[in-house]
Amino acid sequence: MLNINNKIAKGGYVYSKNIRLAKSKIDKQKCYDVREACSIIKEISFAKFNETVDIAIKLGVNPSHSSQVVRGVAAMPSGTGKTVKVAVICQEEKLDEFKTTGADIVGSLDIIEAIKSGNIDYDVYITTPAMMVAVSQVARILGPKGLMPNPKLGTVTNDVAAVVKKVKSGQVEFKVDKAGNIHAGIGKISFSIDEIEANINALVSAIIKSKPSEAKGTYLNGIYLSTTMGPSVRLEISNFTESGNERR
């Protein structure tokens, strides 16, 4: 009979055994075609939950220069597999109109006051240009959480219905970190290979289009695909640059 310490050790052994088995099916010296990489991560997935499919992209930019910060939004053709809660902050006279957009909540100053009180219950906040002065009162609260409405991300708009629809259907916000990397969840392991591949292509395409004019040399330096618990698979960059999109 195993004692409790042995049981814990056995659990750790099972996990590490699964990782070793998964890693054994990946050639670390090889860069994989996108479709083959999607197939591999599905094959080696061992977690007992619906893992997120993650992508990590190393960019040839210097984020310490504001002109080389890469940021944007990519619509995921296959969705993200997540339920996104959306809040719309608008003028009082627009409340009835925007309540038909499909947002989870539509309000005005009441939502701003709720945020001030620490009630931040939504994944995306959308507002109109006319409300930006009022919304700026909570910029220090929403900003560090990546929730502040931003014209560059499309979340400051008069076309609220279209943006709510886009957000609800699935999109990924991306921003390069201090090390020059972009990390994003682009779907679930339960997605088909076609669905994962479509989302990868959509995200990388959006990142290529967001290349700063000041960034010189190689833009895409490495792309890795993985799941929440699994090892990473390196992708062949030429899959995305054959048309010359990498360089401007």
From Swiss-Prot:
SUPFAM superfamilies reported in the protein's UniProt record: Ribosomal protein L1
InterPro entries given in the database record: Ribosom_uL1_bac-type, Ribosomal_uL1, Ribosomal_uL1-like, Ribosomal_uL1/biogenesis, Ribosomal_uL1_3-a/b-sand, Ribosomal_uL1_CS
Coiled-coil ranges per UniProt: none
GO BP terms in the entry: regulation of translation; translation
Origin superkingdom: Bacteria
A Pfam family assignment: Ribosomal_L1
Entry annotated with the keyword RNA-binding: yes
Family per record: Belongs to the universal ribosomal protein uL1 family.
PANTHER family (alphabetical): 54S RIBOSOMAL PROTEIN L1, MITOCHONDRIAL (PTHR36427), LARGE RIBOSOMAL SUBUNIT PROTEIN UL1M (PTHR36427:SF3)
Subunit and interaction comment: Part of the 50S ribosomal subunit.
Annotated protein name in UniProt: Large ribosomal subunit protein uL1
Species per Swiss-Prot/TrEMBL record: Orientia tsutsugamushi (strain Boryong)
